[in-house]
Amino acid sequence: VQARVGRRPPKQRQAEMKFVRGHFYFLVKNHFKKVPYIDEVISQDSINTVSNVQYSNNDLWNKIAEDFQFAADNLPPQAEQVGRPDTYTAKAYLAKLRLYQAYEQDDNNNVTNINKERLNEVVTLTNEVINSGKYGLSDDYAKNYLWKYENGKESIFAVQRSLNDGSEVGRIDMSTALNYPMYPAYGCCSFHRPSQNMVNAFQTGLDGLPKF
């Protein structure tokens, strides 16, 4: 492992780490909105004093975006190993972040403005990802959930499960594992099932446009 790591330039290793940091901060911000931002410049003694409102909503999006931008600028177009991000992975994440950021909110979570400049950035980034030719839609949606098709062309970034690493069940992302259908043998979980109201919200007319 050390030999493989040593072959990658320092900037590329930094980009991988910043991408992962951006990945987790994006998830945390998406869930909680106002979160403390702790990076390498914060001393160990200062961590407990960092406020979750040190940055505005927009500024915090920008802080997270800096990691994705650094990753996009310093990662290769093709990763050396499955599970590592590349420049298009970072651009896809940056596009998703800018899409969220474009819908500007007040402190009560009301949308106060739709930033067209950010939306144009989303279009530019997603076009770059699409035109890379690396991704596409599977011929069968179910393949996205079958192990023999893992890391398929619909997968932008997937945490790889490890085996025989000393842990009880291997390193696995339980946040997504909880989404599998309820089944007696599992005794769980079937989270995040769409309601009929949600389905209705996405109904379209014959012209393909949503019914509001």
What are these regions (language model features)?
Residues 1-32, 48-62, 66-82:
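Conserved, well-structured interaction surfaces
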Residues 16, 36, 154-156:
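Beta-sheet entry/capping signal
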Residues 34-58, 104-123:
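Short coil/linker segments at helix-helix boundaries
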Residues 37, 80-81, 138:
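Secondary-structure boundary/capping residues
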Residues 41, 79, 161-163:
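Short, flexible loop/turn elements at secondary-structure junctions
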Residues 69-70, 84-212:
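An aromatic- and glycine-enriched ligand-binding surface/loop that stacks and positions planar moieties
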